[in-house]
Amino acid sequence: MITSVLRYVLALYFCMGIAHGAYFSQFSMRAPDHDPCHDHTGRPVRCVPEFINAAFGKPVIASDTCGTNRPDKYCTVKEGPDGIIREQCDTCDARNHFQSHPASLLTDLNSIGNMTCWVSTPSLSPQNVSLTLSLGKKFELTYVSMHFCSRLPDSMALYKSADFGKTWTPFQFYSSECRRIFGRDPDVSITKSNEQEAVCTASHIMGPGGNRVAFPFLENRPSAQNFENSPVLQDWVTATDIKVVFSRLSPDQAELYGLSNDVNSYGNETDDEVKQRYFYSMGELAVGGRCKCNGHASRCIFDKMGRYTCDCKHNTAGTECEMCKPFHYDRPWGRATANSANSCVACNCNQHAKRCRFDAELFRLSGNRSGGVCLNCRHNTAGRNCHLCKPGFVRDTSLPMTHRKACKSCGCHPVGSLGKSCNQSSGQCVCKPGVTGTTCNRCAKGYQQSRSTVTPCIKIPTKADFIGSSHSEEQDQCSKCRIVPKRLNQKKFCKRDHAVQMVVVSREMVDGWAKYKIVVESVFKRGTENMQRGETSLWISPQGVICKCPKLRVGRRYLLLGKNDSDHERDGLMVNPQTVLVEWEDDIMDKVLRFSKKDKLGQCPEITSHRY
């Protein structure tokens, strides 16, 4: 099917002549009457630029041209009306417009009756003469057609580049001796495993094409019927430049002229006379194809910088519409197909961000629905879609999420709250002990305001809190408080099960016991109870309260060394005779870290049964 269609296109092209290519080139920039990239309902659909002769008017560079250094004489043989083959000679002079044969004539406007020809310098060994055509951007090509003004070359090769001539890939080889000239077996079968392999053939000499050689890019390629889903063939037909390299004009002179078998008929001629018949001459180099836009544009235009580029639709961008335009990264870019235009979709940032990125993992987890992640959310918003309020702000439900003031400040009291954050649903700030209110702006029932910024609200004392505190006989039972030692050493650290740095937040009396609310800030030794950072309680017995052993102050930091005590029924830590409490100072950190390191390495001093 593909082969017959290509042959039909080639036949139609040949019948109309080069003017057909000029026609499409002339109107390829004109905007269509309707947008082919959307159907009548506005739904995006695949669209492609018009089929044109991509070579028309494009520059061609020849490695060799006759008459460049000096006038050259070249001769051809033609069959006259009487059937007699006669030799006709002309002069090529690049300085004379009427006698010059530059490579630019290959892509100009030709007609069947007025064929202008490029001619190479006549030579006894005309090898490795090349023609390089630059298309200016990527095209998806259907065929390359070459119309020769003289006898067809015996051996030549077609190459393509997809990176503006930096690298070259062979397209097709032509030769009557493929193995000798190109080191390739002739007419190799193409399978799906070698669809990008260049084939060597002698069909140009043996076929009925006369002086024209045409190479259809997809002919005999197995995946041509499924081109949309074949990245291999899509790459195969993509090119920015085409190069033709002539390797051999003819195996021998007699074959060149199609004369009698008497190869010595020109034996008396000089080398200069013989070489006048050895040259390459081509009148037309045509390349049929479409501007490559990956199904996202119906035409190509010149941009403000003068570059030939696709007029991209479907929220795509790039010279070939090969990427999504900025802020349209909610889905991955894809080539448009007959079933899906694969339009790029804008990120959903609720109008709070101007930039976003694509996250493939999020896209997969969403069931291939959304993968956009908003960047630099503004207006105090946060989240991948700027759909949340950042810490310190809460949603104003009276306004839509797209409003620039959709997130308002929590307004947490700087003294009564533990931070600036609040509950995203209720707006409730996190209050310090004894503080209440949505913004933590007042003392709770049973508490009174203090002058401390650490504990702004303290519990109002009751008579029960002071029972027994004035009994002198109990005070007489108090001895020296060993819980607060004069100095801290390695042995004390090693004998205790846990070691933490804590800050005292509040104090209250419960049945004669002093209950301190503390926050463990650092853990140097966890013990079997697996001490963790965070809020907990520290209990001091009634006797310790009376004796003020230890004497703790709200807002101060301490180093607490203790033994595991799971017998008591109170939650938190218990101060007992084995507890060591040292008020935290700046120079204590290094000492504690040193003790902790030795303890972990088993370098503790020998421990006796003495209590300390």
Curated annotation (Swiss-Prot):
SUPFAM superfamilies: EGF/Laminin, TIMP-like. Glycans are attached at residues 114, 128, 268, 368, 423, 564. Keywords: Basement membrane, Disulfide bond, Extracellular matrix, Glycoprotein, Laminin EGF-like domain, Neurogenesis, Repeat, Secreted, Signal. GO terms for biological process: animal organ morphogenesis; axon guidance; dendrite development; dendrite morphogenesis; dorsal/ventral axon guidance; establishment or maintenance of actin cytoskeleton polarity; gonad morphogenesis; interneuron axon guidance. Residues 1-21 form the signal peptide. Coiled coil: none annotated. Residues 43-290 form the Laminin N-terminal domain. Pfam families: EGF_laminin, EGF_LMN_ATRN, Laminin_N, NTR. One of its GO terms (cellular component) is axon. Disulfide bonds join 117-149, 291-300, 293-310, 312-321, 324-344, 347-356, 349-374, 377-386, 389-407, 410-422, 412-429, 431-440, 443-457, 478-547, 494-604. GO terms for molecular function: signaling receptor binding. The keyword Electron transport does not apply. Residues 291-346, 347-409, 410-459 form the Laminin EGF-like domain. Residues 478-604 form the NTR domain. InterPro entries: EGF-like_dom (IPR000742), Laminin/Netrin_ECM (IPR050440), Laminin_N (IPR008211), LE_dom (IPR002049), LMN_ATRN_NET-like_EGF (IPR056863), Netrin_domain (IPR001134), Netrin_module_non-TIMP (IPR018933), TIMP-like_OB-fold (IPR008993). Disruption phenotype: Defective gonad distal tip cell (DTC) migration whereby DTCs migrate towards the midbody of the hermaphrodite on the ventral side rather than the dorsal side of the body resulting in ventrally located gonad arms. Double knockout with mig-38 RNAi results in failed gonad DTC migration to the midbody of the hermaphrodite. It comes from the Eukaryota. PROSITE patterns: EGF_1, EGF_LAM_1, EGF_LAM_2, LAMININ_NTER, NTR. It is found in: Secreted, Extracellular space, Extracellular matrix, Basement membrane. Mutations that delete the second laminin EGF-like repeat impair only dorsal migrations of mesodermal cells and axons. Binds to unc-5 and unc-40 receptors. Component of an extracellular matrix cue that guides dorsoventral migrations on the epidermis. Required for the guidance of pioneer axons and migrating cells along the body wall. In particular, it is required for the guidance of axons from neurons, including SubL neurons and AIY interneurons, into the nerve ring. During gonad morphogenesis, involved in distal tip cell (DTC) migration from the dorsal side of the hermaphrodite body to the midbody to allow for formation of gonad arms. Its association with either unc-40 or unc-5 receptors will lead to axon attraction or repulsion, respectively. This is Netrin unc-6.
